[in-house]
Amino acid sequence: MDKLKSFITALCFFLTTSVCMAQNEIISHGISTFGDLKYEKDFKHLSYVNPDAPKGGEISFWAFGSFDSMHPYTRKGRAGAYSSIFFESLLEGTSDEIDSAYGLIAKEIEYPEDRSWVIFTLRSEVLFSDGSPLTAKDVLFSYKLLKEKGLPSFRAVLEKDIQSAELISDRKIKFIFNEEVPKRDLINTVGGLPIFSEKYFTDNKVDFEASTLTPALGSGPYILDKVDVGK
């Protein structure tokens, strides 16, 4: 009888603990370290953006120096300014908050209070610029690619901070962070990685470490029309 009571007590403790742990998991459309998110779920536009602004036209930016590459994620060559605009990330920050980030490719994020791991759920409507779907496999591919062949700054951070990454489904991916590292900013770090198309790199046998004037396939709002090297 005593054994049965002990078993029931242990079971109740386990179930209570499990419920508490589940209650401590946060599901949100964004994340902020300092204070609450400014924008609610499904917000239509940022407060400093004019949704009725004229579409089309021409815009010019300037930058110091010259360039001979449109690949900003390799040590080879000198990448042109704004050569990263062809790619999107899971999360995107805003200009009117200190450190908030909202789902871009990701629809929502799930994480515990200690931020020891994070699950990203991707939007089903996100496509690469060639019309192919962007899935969690592309996110995993991009993470591994940057960890193995990316800039030293990417490699160092991903190697030190991330314990593992695993696919849950076509639309879900989980990152588990190393126990011994500070975790406050790690969700933002992973959420800010550029996402590449695994199929594009495989089908075209693209060498990620090579300098090139042809940007890889991305899901961003821009594609390259032409480039004048050094101008």
Residue positions per predicted region:
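Bacterial N-terminal signal peptides that target proteins for export
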Residues: 1-8
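Bacterial N-terminal signal peptides
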Residues: 9-18
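Short, intrinsically disordered, charge-balanced linker/junction segments flanking boundaries
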Residues: 18-21, 223-231
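N-terminal lobe/hinge region of extracytoplasmic solute-binding protein
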Residues: 23-114, 144, 203-204, 214-225
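Aromatic- and charge-enriched surface segment that lines or borders ligand/interaction sites
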Residues: 49-54, 75-82, 108-152, 168, ...
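Solvent-exposed loop/turn segments at secondary-structure junctions
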Residues: 65-69, 116, 125-127, 146-149, ...
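Short, solvent-exposed loop/turn and secondary-structure capping segments
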Residues: 71-74, 132, 185-189
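Surface-exposed binding/hinge segments that line
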Residues: 121, 156-202, 221-223, 228
